[in-house]
């Protein structure tokens, strides 16, 4: 083979390699651009268009060099380098999308379980040994019937039900020896635990069935203002578990005026409970046992607004975010010692890490205004977190923050909406002005509870003038006033 033919053969090989490299580059870069535009990534200051232009420029230069058989070694270097950059970028974007999507993964359903329970020392070990159970069919009949149908199907056992007024009443009957077995819905267990902290050691579950409940799709907002329901639970198990909501904050956001209003509704507020609560009055925290939809609809009815999205968080693990942010600073207006952690908080500005923050937001018994003061402290910590999260520095660490909290937070806000908010903040800069308010009322012990009809519970009867003032403030922010 002559030198000319060798050069010709080498040139054909290099062109073939370059064509293959160009095809790989176009495939990777095309998929990368698809994700960038689909999820609105880099959609500020035209960075997504700049990225597109760079991709097309590299592709065009590579194509022209191949066609005109110029600088073949440089072409190989250019395409290999571009493939590496595209691969790394694509991996980062896919990781980011995957992490964020996990926050949405369980947003369309909630989980709970229903069990048949007997006394811990009972000789009964299987539901086939039973002929009847005690359960509150008047307040939770649908779930009870689901369990009975499952037992009949899987265990070939048909159980009759002795009526009780509530799950708490059923538990009392079991402990008193008036019944051999009860049905127990997991979402009501913390209600029993509030009166009988050692209840779990007194019983054993001989049959358990898990269920899921569909959650309503988000009411997507195309306006510059919207409402987010922030629900704080403090429970074991997955974030998708149904549980009482001890923190109930309505976050009203106006992107035009850069205002955020946090409205705290005390957990003991006496309100008509929507959905599973049959619009019967009870304390707000009990709405959570019927699912997050019930809490949302209850607050929508109370304040006369639409709630577009929700964020549900396990408060204990969520506060770990504070350590990622380097702690937060809040103003404490009364000296107190928290039961959790025995932390002492003086009057004035205090710097909190995650453990101190947990003690700060949990305490209510040492505070002058009890649960309302606790709600105000929760607001202070959330405001402090929001102020750090909306800083440019925090947005740069967005992926790290989400990665650490994916098992602690559940939200139905789509990734595209999240990215629109991030892009708008990066585009405009500045900080949001955050204000807060709380619904006020009078404490009473004589109001009936739909979920716990046999108990005398502390309730907060809502003050009508306070409700009117709170509703007006929410509307002002929504309307940009």
Which role fits each region the language model picked out?
Residues 104-112, 118-120, 126, 131-481:
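Non-catalytic, solvent-exposed segments at the cell envelope interface
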């Amino acid at each position: 083979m002559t030198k000319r033919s060798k050069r010709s053969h080498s040139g054909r090989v290099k062109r073939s390699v370059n064509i293959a490299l160009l095809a790989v580059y176009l495939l990777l870069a095309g998929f990368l651009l698809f994700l960038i535009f689909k999820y609105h990534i880099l959609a500020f200051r035209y960075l997504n268009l700049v990225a597109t232009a760079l991709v097309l420029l590299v592709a065009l230069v590579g194509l022209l060099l191949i066609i005109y058989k110029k600088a073949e070694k440089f072409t190989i270097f250019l395409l290999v380098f571009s493939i590496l950059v595209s691969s790394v970028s694509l991996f980062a974007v896919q990781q980011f999308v995957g992490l964020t999507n996990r926050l949405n993964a369980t947003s369309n359903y909630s989980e709970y379980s229903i069990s048949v329970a007997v006394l811990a020392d009972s000789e009964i070990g299987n539901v086939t040994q039973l002929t009847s159970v005690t359960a509150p069919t008047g307040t939770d009949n649908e779930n009870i019937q689901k369990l009975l149908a499952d037992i009949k199907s899987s265990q070939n056992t048909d159980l009759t039900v002795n009526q009780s007024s509530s799950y708490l009443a059923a538990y009392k009957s079991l402990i008193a020896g008036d019944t051999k077995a009860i049905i127990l819905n997991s979402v009501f267990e913390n209600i029993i635990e509030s009166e009988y902290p050692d209840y779990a050691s007194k019983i054993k579950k001989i049959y358990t069935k898990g269920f899921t409940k569909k959650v309503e799709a988000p009411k997507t907002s195309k306006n510059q203002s919207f409402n987010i329901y922030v629900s704080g639970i403090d429970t074991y198990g997955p974030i998708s578990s149904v549980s009482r909501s001890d923190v109930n904050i309505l976050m009203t956001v106006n992107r035009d005026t850069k205002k955020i209003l946090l409205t705290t509704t005390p957990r003991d507020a006496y309100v008509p409970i929507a959905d599973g609560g049959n619009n019967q009055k009870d304390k707000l925290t009990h709405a959570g046992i019927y699912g997050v939809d019930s809490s949302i609809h209850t607050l929508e009815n109370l304040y006369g607004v639409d709630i577009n999205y929700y964020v549900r968080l396990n408060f204990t693990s969520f506060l770990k975010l504070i350590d990622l942010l380097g702690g937060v600073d809040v103003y404490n207006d009364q000296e107190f010692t928290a039961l959790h952690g025995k932390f002492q908080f003086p009057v004035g500005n205090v710097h909190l890490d995650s453990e101190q923050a947990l003690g700060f937001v949990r305490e209510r018994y040492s505070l002058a205004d009890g649960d309302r003061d606790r709600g105000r402290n929760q607001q202070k910590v959330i405001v402090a977190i929001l102020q750090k999260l909306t800083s440019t520095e925090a947005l740069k660490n967005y992926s790290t923050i989400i990665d650490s909290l994916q098992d602690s937070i559940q939200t139905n806000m789509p990734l595209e909406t999240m990215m629109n908010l991030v892009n708008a903040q990066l585009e405009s800069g500045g900080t949001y002005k955050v204000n807060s308010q709380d619904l006020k009322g009078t404490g009473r012990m004589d109001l009936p509870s739909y979920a716990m009809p046999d108990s005398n519970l502390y309730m907060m009867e809502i003050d009508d003038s306070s409700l009117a003032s709170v509703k007006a403030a929410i509307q002002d922010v929504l309307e940009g006033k």
